[in-house]
């Protein structure tokens, strides 16, 4: 019996060795040197990489290699795509979809694992991203065993990562120095508020404990500015008390109270453009504001206003370079170009982006820009 198992293991090893040898010797594109063929593969458009990988084992190995995305970025071939996490209140359906910002075409992503499709509300989850690595992270939902998944754009696939140490719901998350932080929220079946914070390292697939929040904060909004993560609970009716907020310094590993001007003027969903904090206000004609740390004040951004007849709440906002993307009900998208004048004032110019007709009943819960 032992001899049969040994023989079987040897055969398996030999088969693997033969497959590796065949893959190495197999040209990527017949008649072309592999270095030239790789340049051709680098220009294959997203989201069809899953189909391209099925062409041959050599294509699959090349496209799934982390060096492939690095090469696209170093050659300035990677392009920004807008990813939207949307939900339908009537049917409780949730889905991710992506917009090619160059062509205006929309794609629906593969569904997330089942444990994430049975949640009570999309806001029970929290989403973060690593734009230049082309990865989306979806956390939470309360499932002890499957509380974290990652979407990799190059493979167009979801995969489970190590579960969070404290599975939670209704919390905020963000990418701080290449690590994904999960802050606060509710834990347990009774929804008990928590101040616990943890950080995920994608390099070794591990979670570690981070210094706790000094206080419980209701989920509203958060933003990562440089090496700091700002968390605010926002204003709450009847507006008798100013909102609370905390700022995490990743260099010091400590929390400090958010300045009064920052937390009191944070009256909308935020986006960080070139290390400056902006918000799209959720009242009136949805004016855009920018935070000025020098005097702890907010200033209105001049220029056009969002088209109120097309842009209806709820909003999800993200940014890339000097552009801001606002996703509204019906998955209507407005793209704003932000510019800074010589006097330090900011202005914005808006344009509407095509929205998928099939998503008219959907509303956004989160959005991110990835480079693919």
From Swiss-Prot:
<keyword id="KW-0880">Kelch repeat</keyword>
<feature type="repeat" description="Kelch 4">
    <location>
        <begin position="229"/>
        <end position="276"/>
    </location>
</feature>
<feature type="repeat" description="Kelch 5">
    <location>
        <begin position="279"/>
        <end position="325"/>
    </location>
</feature>
<dbReference type="GO" id="GO:0016567">
    <property type="term" value="P:protein ubiquitination"/>
</dbReference>
<keyword id="KW-0677">Repeat</keyword>
<comment type="function">
    <text>Component of SCF (ASK-cullin-F-box) E3 ubiquitin ligase complexes, which may mediate the ubiquitination and subsequent proteasomal degradation of target proteins. Part of the phyA-mediated signaling transduction pathway leading to the regulation of gene expression and hypocotyls elongation in response to red and far-red light exposure.</text>
</comment>
<dbReference type="GO" id="GO:0010017">
    <property type="term" value="P:red or far-red light signaling pathway"/>
</dbReference>
<comment type="pathway">
    <text>Protein modification; protein ubiquitination.</text>
</comment>
<dbReference type="InterPro" id="IPR006652">
    <property type="entry name" value="Kelch_1"/>
</dbReference>
<feature type="repeat" description="Kelch 1">
    <location>
        <begin position="80"/>
        <end position="126"/>
    </location>
</feature>
<dbReference type="Pfam" id="PF00646">
    <property type="entry name" value="F-box"/>
</dbReference>
<protein>
    <recommendedName>
        <fullName>F-box protein AFR</fullName>
    </recommendedName>
</protein>
<feature type="compositionally biased region" description="Polar residues">
    <location>
        <begin position="1"/>
        <end position="15"/>
    </location>
</feature>
<feature type="region of interest" description="Disordered">
    <location>
        <begin position="1"/>
        <end position="27"/>
    </location>
</feature>
<dbReference type="InterPro" id="IPR001810">
    <property type="entry name" value="F-box_dom"/>
</dbReference>
<feature type="repeat" description="Kelch 3">
    <location>
        <begin position="179"/>
        <end position="227"/>
    </location>
</feature>
<dbReference type="InterPro" id="IPR036047">
    <property type="entry name" value="F-box-like_dom_sf"/>
</dbReference>
<comment type="subunit">
    <text>Part of a SCF (ASK-cullin-F-box) protein ligase complex. Interacts with SKP1A.</text>
</comment>
<feature type="domain" description="F-box">
    <location>
        <begin position="29"/>
        <end position="74"/>
    </location>
</feature>
<dbReference type="Pfam" id="PF01344">
    <property type="entry name" value="Kelch_1"/>
</dbReference>
<dbReference type="InterPro" id="IPR015915">
    <property type="entry name" value="Kelch-typ_b-propeller"/>
</dbReference>
<dbReference type="GO" id="GO:0009585">
    <property type="term" value="P:red, far-red light phototransduction"/>
</dbReference>
<feature type="repeat" description="Kelch 2">
    <location>
        <begin position="135"/>
        <end position="178"/>
    </location>
</feature>
<keyword id="KW-0833">Ubl conjugation pathway</keyword>
<keyword id="KW-0607">Phytochrome signaling pathway</keyword>
């Amino acid at each position: 019996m032992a001899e049969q198992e040994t023989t079987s293991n040897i055969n398996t090893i030999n088969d693997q060795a033969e497959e590796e040898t065949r893959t190495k010797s197999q040209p990527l594109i017949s008649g072309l040197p592999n270095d030239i063929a790789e340049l051709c593969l680098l220009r294959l458009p997203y989201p069809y990489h899953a189909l391209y990988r099925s062409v041959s084992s050599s294509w699959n190995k090349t496209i799934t290699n982390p060096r492939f995305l690095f090469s696209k970025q170093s050659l300035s071939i990677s392009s920004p795509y807008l990813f939207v996490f949307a939900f339908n209140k009537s049917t409780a359906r949730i889905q991710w979809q992506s917009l090619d910002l160059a062509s205006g075409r929309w794609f629906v992503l593969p569904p997330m694992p089942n444990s994430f499709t049975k949640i009570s509300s999309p806001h029970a989850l929290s989403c973060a991203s690593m734009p230049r690595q082309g990865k989306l992270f979806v956390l939470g939902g309360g499932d002890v065993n499957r509380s974290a998944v990652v979407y990799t754009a190059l493979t167009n696939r979801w995969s489970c990562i190590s579960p969070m140490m404290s599975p939670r719901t209704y919390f905020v998350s963000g990418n701080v120095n290449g690590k994904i932080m999960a802050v606060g929220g509710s834990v347990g079946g009774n929804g008990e508020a928590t101040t616990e914070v943890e950080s995920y390292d994608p390099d070794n697939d591990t979670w570690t404990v981070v210094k706790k929040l000094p206080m419980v904060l209701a989920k509203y909004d958060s933003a990562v500015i440089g090496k700091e993560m700002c968390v605010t609970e926002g204003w709450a009716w009847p507006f008798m008390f100013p909102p609370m907020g905390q700022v995490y310094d990743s260099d010091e590993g400590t929390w400090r109270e958010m300045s009064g001007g920052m937390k009191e003027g944070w009256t909308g969903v935020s986006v960080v453009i070139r290390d400056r904090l902006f918000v799209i206000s959720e009242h009136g004609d949805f004016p855009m504001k920018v935070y000025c740390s020098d005097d702890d004040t907010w200033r209105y951004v001049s220029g056009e206003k969002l088209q109120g007849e097309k842009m209806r709440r709820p909003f999800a906002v993200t940014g890339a370079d000097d552009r801001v993307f606002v996703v509204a009900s019906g998955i209507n998208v407005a793209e704003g170009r932000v510019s800074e004048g010589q006097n330090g004032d900011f202005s914005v110019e808006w344009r509407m982006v095509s929205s998928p007709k099939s998503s008219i009943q959907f509303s956004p819960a989160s959005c991110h820009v990835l480079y693919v």
